[in-house]
Amino acid sequence: MPDFRDPATLLRHVADTMAFYHPRCVDPSGGFFHYFKDDGAVYDTTTRHLVSSARFVFNYAQAYRHFQDPAYLEAARHGLAFLRDAHRNPDTGGYAWEVCWERGKARPLDATNHCYGLAFVLLACAHAYQAGVAEARAYIDETFALMEEKFWEEEHGLYADQASANWKERDPYRGQNANMHACEAMLAAFEATGAPHFLHRAEELAHNITVRQAALADGLIWEHYHADWTIDWDYNRDDPKNLFRPWSFQPGHFTEWAKLLLNLERHGAALRASSDWLLPRARALFDAAVTHAWDDQYGGLAYGFGPDGSVCDDDKYFWVQAESIAAAAVLAVRTGDASYWDWYDRLWDYSWRHFVDHRHGAWYRILARDNSKLSDEKSPAGKTDYHTMGACYEVLKVFAI
């Protein structure tokens, strides 16, 4: 296995992953293709999902900043224009969750507004701006204002999740996932602009999910809540593999939060309150994830475990391993605790052997518990290898500190 403690190795891996997508993912008529088989063949040319549309902008903006290829910057601009022109409804300001793109025109397939989607629009705008797309600066403020107006619930200090296309109906479902990615986006917006209100919103989201809400579940983070932010233990119990709202504790979200908490800590002097709580919570969440979810027999972290602590979904997902790699590195550098380097190496060894496609590039999306493949669909809507390349960028960032 390559030495993933070497920054050059991480950059090579990003370049190899980008090579799976670029340039085949770019649709000259607008945006990107979103559905790829293992060998890179596109198996759906028209369906465009907001999450993929935004994540591709992140991918290209980050790639441009690290590799300085003008084609990457052009692709980031191309993707940002698609978000604005195809997903965004100029009459409502909302963003369609899914559109059909044919002959240069977008037709909404699902015009529902999701806070999760807006978080990724904000993330895309922030990274595009950092890459040099000047017009993205105004889009950052516009998207934040939309999230605040339509989804922010001051009495709970968190964002609601979903609203109708015309914004008149707000779904009673509340979820931690949208708030976690909103925190990520707010951090990116702060780092892009220096505007403190983004950092303070990220700080509030992080505390309210990982401390206040976690206190309702013995310090762990449940995914689903009622409108008053009491835990809904039964939501999607009959649909445990739901793509964005699975029933279970999600160890991948524990480690993702651990990473975000320590990203917040880096800006400790600019936070509103003490940063003393961030490291202990990050360690506790990471440690809970690997304790409950690591598979001693086949390796890798399982997807989900139930309230009783037992694994309820033993499939292995690419993003769970990737986010845990990033969190392990951040914790290792922050604490000096060698056990986190052990986890970093163990997770890379597992992922390199089972998830990385050494023939065609990029990572497989999902494997069975025994690491056998479940599908030849490497990158359906939502994947884009944003998590895998993002993890590499995160590790590169902490190596540079």
Residue ranges of model-derived segments:
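Glycan-recognition and catalytic cores of secretory/periplasmic carbohydrate-active enzymes
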Residues: 1-401
